[in-house]
Every structure is written in C-alpha cells, then in structure tokens.
Amino acid sequence: MTEHIMIIRHAEKPSVAEGIGGVDADGQASEGGLSVRGWQRAGALVAYFSARGTHASHIATPVVIFAAASHAKSQRPVLTVQPLAESLGVPLLSHYRSGADEAQVLTHALHTSGPVLICWRHESISMFAHLLGHPEAGEWGQDCFDAVWVFRREGEQWRWTITPQALLASDERLPRSTA
C-alpha cells in the first residue's frame, strides 16, 4: 500500500477574458488544451517529480499517475502529466471522471506500491483530502496552479501538507498552511 499521495491541479488553461488561447500537444488551437504557460508548467513538472529534480524532500517520483478523464471541454489534466508519465515510463490512468470517481481513484491509489501522483480539476480536489481524513480542506483556489497537496501516511492517519511547486517566475515560493 502506498504511503505517499501527491495531488496537483492541471496546468494553466486558456482565458477568453484575458485573450489567452489554448493549444493541444501538437500546437494546434484548442480551448480544451493548455495555455502556453500551462505547457511550460507541464514540462517543468518532469524534472520536479523525477529523480533529476531538486525539490522538497516530501516530493517523490511517482510510480503511477492518475489524471481526470478528458471530455469535450477539457483535456488539461491528461495534457499536464502526459510528458511526465512518458519521461518516467510509468502508467497514466485517465479513465476516472472528476466529480464522480474520486473514491475509486483513491482505492486504486491506496493499493499501489510506491508514491502516487493525482492530477485533477480544482473543483473536486478537496474530495481527496476529505476521504483521507481532512474535512477541514477547503476548495482548491480557482487561480492556483502551482501547489502540491502532499499526504503522507503516519500510522492510521494521513499527514497533509501544501508545498509550492515554485517552477515558474510568478509561482508562490512559501509553503501554504493547512490549518
């Protein structure tokens, strides 16, 4: 059983209001894709979660990655972690639906030997925290793309910390409180 679960939100998305378009993996216009900044983050996550990365000691290289299933309006969770999964040569499981399958994802993750990374949509990330015994977890911030929720097993409980990715120029640099 895993002792280590890390959760991130998908990378930055397009914004019609700000005139920021999205692109798919081939560079073609796609409102369901990532913004250019999102693609920068997806690339930076490869080093961050790999043994080559220089990061906090509680960030580990995942042995499996879960991403919320793509749908007509968004492929962002898969696009965010696909470069990482390919670089590491680990499974990318993307058939679970955001807002419906969080308990199944967690059951699968808990039966994994080694660290797990979950990339999800912000509206449903707090469900994972609640299922791991942290009902105090609020909603993931609508404009937050640069944090990692880290859960480490301590006996029968899960310790929860929030770690900044600090990958891109305007990313938060200080740890966030879980209190």
Q: For each predicted feature, which ranges?
A:
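Active-site-proximal alpha-helix that buttresses catalytic centers in soluble enzyme cores
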Residues: M1-S113, S124-A179
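Conserved beta-strand position immediately N-terminal to the Walker
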Residues: V116
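Short beta-strand segments
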Residues: C119-R121
